[in-house]
Amino acid sequence: KMESLQATAAYDLELRIAADDPDQLVGFFAPTVTLPGPLAARVSLQGQFDQWETSQGRLEISSDGVEVVLDGYLLAMGKNDRRLDIELKTDSLSRLGRLFAMSLPDSAPVRLVGSVKGSGAGIVIDSAQFDVGTSDFRGSIEYVRLDDAGRKPRINAQLVSEHFDRKDFQTLATRASARMPPEKFFSDRQLVLDWISDNDIHLDYRANTAVVGEHHMKDLELTAIVEDGKLVLDEIRAEMQGAQMKVTLELDARQRPYDIHYSYQLSGLQVARWLTGNKVIQPLTGEVDIEVKLTGKGNSIREVVSHADGYAVMVIHRARIPRKARILLPTSVLMSVLRTINPFAKASPVYNIECGLIGFRIDDGKAFSDHTLALKAKEVTVLAAGTIDLATEEIAIAIRPKAREGLGISTVSLAGIYYRLGGTLAKPVVKAASERILKTGVTLGAAWLSSGLTVLAKGLFDRLGDKGDVCKNAAHRFDTLLDGTAFTLKPTVN
């Protein structure tokens, strides 16, 4: 509808379009975005012919699982700070990635509202508020599209959340499989990280609460930088069950397999705050420290750990730990050992541990313990050594318990008794073994240890009766086993 044919006439435009190839249409209104067909669009626009930059209207687009509504200065975004209000809905971030000609991961449904303005070769969304499943975000996002010089699309974002849940950024199949008992401890699901190679990203992020697997965190802070195909998460910090968590991650996606450097530290985990709804005997006391460092290559978690180098250690300080407590994901290997290293704990719903150290050095996917698995419990002292093949997940650990005097267990009844912790990480099994068979296996080391460690002499088991503190001695052996590797955690002495 036109007021007249004069250049100053007002107009009112209503337009509906269905298109199999909508690039030219969308490019006319929003040149920084592309949409795959088929597309349905509705446009309403009002203004004057000689003042087209002041024309205002509404654009509704529906295409391939993405719905976008733009309100405001449709013809002049980017000029004189003209802005558009935006509302966007899609069933996955991956579809949103196609909207901006970039690769983004799968996710739960997405809803975004904000104010958009043009900025050079890109757009800026101010006062952005968006939800991904149960996770909420607010802040500002800048998107710079692929330019003529071949530079990658870039995203700069400053975001905060009241709540974040990692499962909102997983596929339905991944979320469903997480609820099933795993046949294998380490996932062989292929890592899909094309978005790291395809985009440059700088993200500053804070969350009041965050859930990642079994991790329930508070006050999460991180800076993520993706540049030239490399992802760097520089010291993620959060509070978790009273402990301070620090995580760093470097991942090179420019090559296959991916090159990964990972560090995880949890200091002062309070056992009383560890549980997530389990009914166990109270009170629970004590603290646990955990540290894991890994370097490896692979296209799945299984491939990465199969040839990884590094170490993993847990230090326990005077703790009552429930045997059936739900376990934090990165520490489950250590807790699998803790669950089975004390054969006399089955009758009790909690571990009464005065001190403990569970330490492994990891070389080429083999986790070795040179008598660096030690527990001093109420009834018994335990020393163990052996190996875990992270590629096959097979466990071969020798366990020697010794009853503590005056605590109701006959020292004679334990004389010469050894146990073998076998099976796999997903299904560990403890079996009693004769001293002759077990000591022969430990002495030869051929079946259990292939790294050339010769310190597993059978006499070390007999040192359990030494006057020294079993935890302190195990800590000294772990320092030696690491051979100069940085180890910042120390066990409580006595």
Go through each PLM region and give its residues.
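Flexible beta-edge/linker motif
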Residues: 149-169, 302-304
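Outer-membrane beta-barrel proteins
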Residues: 24-26, 95-97, 137, 166-170, ...
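Solvent-exposed beta-strand/coil patches in large extracellular/periplasmic or lumenal scaffold regions
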Residues: 1, 28-31, 39-73, 91, ...
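Short proline/glycine-enriched turn/loop segments at secondary-structure junctions
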Residues: 4-5, 32, 147-148, 281, ...
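Short "repeat-start/strand-capping" segments in structured domains, especially the N-termini
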Residues: 9-12, 81, 143-144, 152-155, ...
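Extended amphipathic ligand-handling, pore-lining, and cofactor/metal-binding catalytic surfaces
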Residues: 314, 437-438
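Short hydrophobic membrane-inserting alpha-helices and related fusion/pore-forming segments
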Residues: 440-463
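Soluble, non-transmembrane catalytic domains of enzymes that act on hydrophobic metabolites at membranes
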Residues: 399-403, 412-420
